[in-house]
Amino acid sequence: MDKVKKAVLAFSGGLDTSVILKWLQDTYQCEVVTFTADIGQGEEIEPARAKAVQFGIREIFIEDLREEFVRDYVFPMFRANTIYEGEYLLGTSIARPLIAKRQVEIAQQTGADAVSHGATGKGNDQVRFELGYYALQPDIRVIAPWREWDLTSREKLLTYAEKQGIPIEMKQKAGSPYSMDANLLHISYEGRALEDPAAEPEESMWRWTVSPETAPSEPEYLDLEYERGDIVALNGERLSPAAILTRLNQLGGKHGIGRLDLVENRYVGMKSRGCYETPGGTIMLRAHRAIESITLDREVAHLKDDLMPRYAALIYNGYWWSPERKLLQVLIDESQVNVNGRVRVKLYKGNVMVVGRDSRTDSLFDPDIATFEEDGGAYHQADAAGFIKLNALRMRIAKALRRC
């Protein structure tokens, strides 16, 4: 095994990464730097510092990345109306590039020659992290313990922790019926009780949203203001990106918005069942399409829709730092220059309904032309005959030749 001098570990302080930290020290005999990112997972992260100190870690990085996460990753993704396989809003996928970037930057700052993560050898996250590492520092050494060790179950992890004297809180020992991951965009649930795709999840599983059945009986209206494709104000109050998403999560959760139960195709080849809560993101997606509907040229909007599945797959599969994703982002961002205005939505029992949209500066909606009433000659209906005949020409020729 090649000698590793120092490794930067993505460290949550939970069971898995606590075991990994000790395993790295024992197996590689290397110095470990811990990096803990606050991306809105809603958990106390300072205990990770205390645990790292217990392991004798001298270089401990704990960073609040919530604003950067939403501003530089979530918002750019939503400019494309991104959905994977028609349903998934990519809450886990979009968080990995930022974590990978900071790990590499910390490695460069501290002189580390390796990085390590706690993703399993079965999932997509190992790919997402490592594609990011290699894209940002091609010669970095990657240590993926789940692909090396024989600790293949939770029970084995707990046994190892006990033997090594690794402090594990009672709630970590008790575990959860699900494997969960959270950030400001979503919370996900996988594995264990969800491995039967035919079984309905228990209501107690959902943490961010109330059931639509028990949501308030009165609707709630929201006004969202857009500048260059991004939300900048909510109900007239200008807020930071992270504050906007936090507030939308609260409002969406209150009205039972954003629950999803799906089977997705993982990049590594298997199908996986997952449940997600993305209340704020669900509102954002619906509202963004609404503001685009009056500010984007038809062909630009259709081109974006054509490119979106490819863009979504790049993010899902871990290619955020690839040249093709960056190229698509330039195109997407250029399309948003005139996406300015206001959208009004109604939240009611799991539904997000667009009830109004306007743009004082960039609307392409012309009421004089679109009206069903007298238009004063703005649109000459007789002109449509030639348009229709020319577009029908190829079909008329084919019919004459009995090809259709």
Swiss-Prot record:
Pathway entry: Amino-acid biosynthesis; L-arginine biosynthesis; L-arginine from L-ornithine and carbamoyl phosphate: step 2/3
Entry GO CC: cytoplasm
Residue sites binding L-aspartate per the record: 120, 124-125
Domain of life of the native organism: Bacteria
GO molecular function, one term: ATP binding
Residues reported in the UniProt entry to bind L-citrulline: 88, 93, 124, 128, 179, 188, 264, 276
Positions annotated to bind ATP: 10-18, 37, 118
Family, per entry: Belongs to the argininosuccinate synthase family. Type 1 subfamily.
Protein name, entry field: Argininosuccinate synthase
